[in-house]
Amino acid sequence: MERVPILKIGDILLVSIQVDMSDQTAVQLQEDLAERIVATGCHGVIIDITALDIVDSFVGRMLSTIASISKVLDAETVVVGMRPAVAITLVELGLSLNGIRTALNVERGMELIAASRADEWDAAADDEDTETTATA
């Protein structure tokens, strides 16, 4: 069975899918990724599907499942490298990638995750300011 490599870049895990996704490979990827998120404390997951010529309903569901698992573990998922034909196929199949943000490439995906984390920090700082003002 082939394994999909998971690379750590800063606070982000990069998954580059370069193999055909069998059921077994998908389940293994889900388990490996969940373990890596917990082990590293990363808050972002980028899934690069540039090498995939076809994304069928199985791969679409797998991406949604990975995003859900990542979200439960406090990591945001961004899918990058989607080709126009793949996007068209997903729409034609009626698949919505709930909970998954998309970006054109890895760099843009990293920017999305960084911006999202910055927004969370700003919101947390605002909450602290409100609590401090209320108790003063």
Residue ranges and their predicted role:
Residues 2-30:
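STAS-typified acidic loop motif
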Residues 5-8, 35-39:
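Short, conserved, surface-exposed binding loops centered on an aromatic residue
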Residues 27-31, 61, 111:
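Short, contiguous clusters of charged residues that form electrostatic/catalytic patches at enzyme active sites
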Residues 30-37, 44-46, 64, 131-133:
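Extended, hydrophobic alpha-helical segments
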Residues 37, 66, 111-116:
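Catalytic cores of nucleotide-enabled group-transfer and carboxylate-activating enzymes in metabolic
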Residues 40-43, 47-96:
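Amphipathic alpha-helical interaction surfaces in cytosolic regulatory modules
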Residues 99-109:
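Short acidic-hydrophobic, aromatic-tinged amphipathic segments that line or gate anion-handling sites
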Residues 115-136:
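Intrinsically disordered or compositionally simple regulatory linkers and C-terminal tails
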